[in-house]
Swiss-Prot record:
Pfam families: Mntp. This is Putative manganese efflux pump MntP. One of its GO terms (cellular component) is plasma membrane. The keyword Manganese applies. The lineage of its organism: Bacteria, Pseudomonadati, Pseudomonadota, Gammaproteobacteria, Enterobacterales. PANTHER family: MANGANESE EFFLUX PUMP MNTP-RELATED. GO terms for molecular function: manganese ion transmembrane transporter activity. SUPFAM superfamilies: MFS general substrate transporter. The chain crosses the membrane at residues 3-23, 41-61, 65-85, 106-126, 133-153, 169-189. It comes from the Bacteria.
Amino acid sequence: MNMYATLILALALSMDAFAASICKGAALHRPHFREAIRTGLIFGLAEACTPLIGWSLGLYASQYIIEWDHWVAFTLLFILGCRMITESFKTKQEKKCESPCRHNSIVLITTAIATSLDAMAIGIGLAFLEVNIVHTAMAIGMMTMIMATLGMLIGRYIGPRLGKRAELIGGLILIAIGFNILFEHLELFMYAK
């Protein structure tokens, strides 16, 4: 795989993280630049590791993983989306009672893992090609880090304009991403038969 194909693959795989980080930035109402960098690093790390995991597993058990990865991604994104929608209806007093640091880290890491499962599936496929998996994974991770950081910064300016609706819209977008992943895999499965 040449450099251009690798960059296009990296950009395509970073789009879910970009959309999810826009939602997170909008829901946080003016996150700091440090939070945007942190989000980018977490998404980038997850997106860089999962193709390596997929590539390793592709050498051994590709058939079993491909059958379930889309269901796992859909379930995680659906649950996170529902949680964001529920959060959008909470009052400020109810939100103050929660530990925001712990809550945000758990949700952020779970979202990063859920949006990177498609990269694991790609890694499985890359196991059957002549490709330098380390360079490819680094390109995917770097592109995702950049796109997720940009997404947070874009969300920072969208959030105040949307108010409480930002979390509601973010939750709906995460659910839509989950359904998109599920339908793409089910559609491919239908054509394979």
